[in-house]
Every structure is written in structure tokens, then in C-alpha cells.
Design a protein with these regions (language model features):
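Active-site-adjacent segment of SDR/Rossmann-fold oxidoreductases
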Residues: 153-154, 175-185
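Substrate-binding pocket helix/loop in short-chain dehydrogenase/reductase
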Residues: 103-105, 112-114
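Canonical Rossmann dinucleotide-binding motif of NAD(H)/NADP(H)-dependent dehydrogenases/reductases
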Residues: 8-40
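C-terminal helical subdomain
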Residues: 182, 189-190, 209-251
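Active-site helix of classical SDR
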Residues: 128, 165-166
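Residue(s) in the substrate-gating loop at a strand-loop-helix junction
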Residues: 148-149
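A short, exposed helix-loop element centered on a Lys and neighboring polar residues
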Residues: 128-129, 174
Length: 254
């Protein structure tokens, strides 16, 4: 049998910025990257929730940086704090996301549209734009944006505004790779199917206990994030889709 080359590498000591780290997928990502030895900067809207997450996860030394990611100046302030603490950044995970109970064009208000687009799309732009210079200081880095299978398969259950924002993130990720690859930046659009997070509680019809039990867990998504960011610099995973087995088999339709 020939020699098998190990494709992964250690990310211990790398600076990882996790957006939306106070709960759900972002919290699970923070836990996974912390376990891998990363130095963590945790960003979310509420400072108290960030502090609680860092404490409960045992993430000693993590920076808790409250910021409204729809406001460019607040995100820029978080980036300055990371630069002052560690000089640069190696990993950015865009994991913040929201939705509203109203999902259809008929039911959505203009304010709800702007709110969801603001966090799920414009917020990712602000975070990526603010932290790119810190990654280029390091000679490169990895950006993972948590998208959704709703980006490719428009779902009335996910909502018009949500699907529109998520599909736009696919194009944003492609643009990052096209424009920033020459600087060693690698971007991935990670699209999970249904994930058991508090976000599903906002559906017009909350899922049954059976359906919820079949969903992905935040830790499943976090493990996929770790896989992407731990590849060597020669490897770019531009698009990764992970499904709950029950959903892709057609048992449950969003």
C-alpha cells in the first residue's frame, strides 16, 4: 500500500473571528475552533450573551466584541480590536442569521425585508470587508459563510427574503475567491439543510419533535467549518452542502 498524505493541518494558534457566536451555529463553531487551539474573537449583538457563551464554553482569553453587523462602523471597531490584540486574523466565519415569522411576499413588510437582508447579506459584506485587511496581513486566510440549502432550492418555508439573501451570498463568495485568491484568501459558502437552532422556532408552523430530531445539529455544521478551514492553503473548498439524511431523502420538505 502506498503512502497516504495527510491533507489536513493544525490551526492551533490561528486567530479566528466568529460572527454570531452567542448562540446556534456560531456558538458551536466557536467551541470547535476553540478546541482546535484557535485564538478567538467572538462577535454578536449582545455583549452579555457573548460573555456568557465564552464562560460556558470555557473559552479563556477569547475577545467578546459586541457589534451590530448591519452597521459598518461597529464592525470596523471590532476589527480594530482584533488588530490591536493579535495584529491580524486567519479565519473568519460568518454565522449570524435571522428570519421573521412572516415569510411570503404578500405578508412581508418592507421593514422585515430590510432587516433580514441587512443581517444575512449586508452584515456579511461588512464583516468580510472589515476583516479582509487583517487576513492579508497574514498572507492569506479562510472565510466560511454559513449560507443555506435555501440558496439553491428556493423554499416557501424559508421565506422570500431569506432565500434572496442566501442566494446572493453564493455570488459574494465567488467574488471573494475571484478577487482575493491572489492574496491567499480562500472563501467557502457552506450550505446546511435544516439545523436544530432557535431560528426554526420562528417558523409559521414550528416543526414536530420527530422532525426536529432528524435535523442537523449545530455541532455538525461546526465540524464542517473546521474541515474547511483546516485544509492546506493549496486547497479551496468554494461550495459545500450538508444535508440531514431525512431531508435529502425526501422524508421532510421545507
Amino acid at each position: 500500500m502506498g503512502e497516504v498524505e495527510q491533507a489536513g493541518g493544525s490551526i492551533a494558534g490561528q486567530v479566528a473571528v466568529v460572527i454570531g457566536a452567542a448562540g446556534g451555529i456560531g456558538r458551536a463553531v466557536a467551541a470547535r475552533l476553540g478546541a482546535a487551539g484557535c485564538r478567538l474573537a467572538l462577535v454578536d449583538l449582545e455583549g452579555a450573551a457573548l460573555q456568557a457563551a465564552a464562560r460556558e464554553l470555557g473559552l479563556e482569553g477569547a475577545l467578546a466584541l459586541p457589534a451590530d453587523i448591519t452597521r459598518a462602523e461597529e464592525v470596523a471597531g471590532a476589527a480594530r480590536a482584533v488588530a490591536e490584540a493579535w495584529g491580524g486574523a486567519d479565519i473568519l466565519v460568518n454565522a449570524a442569521g435571522i428570519n421573521t415569522r412572516e415569510r411570503t411576499l404578500e405578508d412581508l413588510s418592507a421593514e422585515q425585508w430590510e432587516q433580514v437582508i441587512g443581517v444575512n447579506l449586508t452584515g456579511v459584506f461588512h464583516c468580510t470587508r472589515a476583516f479582509l485587511p487583517l487576513m492579508r496581513r497574514r498572507g492569506g486566510g479562510a472565510i466560511v459563510t454559513v449560507v443555506s440549502t435555501a440558496a439553491g432550492l428556493v423554499s416557501p418555508g424559508a421565506g422570500t427574503h431569506y432565500c434572496a439573501a442566501k442566494r446572493a451570498l453564493l455570488s459574494l463568495t465567488e467574488s471573494i475567491n475571484l478577487e482575493q485568491g491572489k492574496h491567499g484568501i480562500r472563501a467557502c459558502a457552506l450550505s446546511p439543510g435544516e439545523v436544530d437552532t432557535p431560528l426554526v422556532d420562528r417558523r409559521p408552523e414550528p416543526p414536530s419533535a420527530e422532525r426536529r430530531a432528524a435535523m442537523l445539529r449545530p455541532a455538525d455544521v461546526a465540524e464542517a467549518v473546521y474541515f474547511v478551514v483546516s485544509r492546506p492553503p493549496r486547497v479551496t473548498i468554494s461550495d459545500l452542502v450538508i444535508w440531514p439524511s431525512a431531508q435529502i431523502s425526501g422524508k421532510y420538505v421545507v
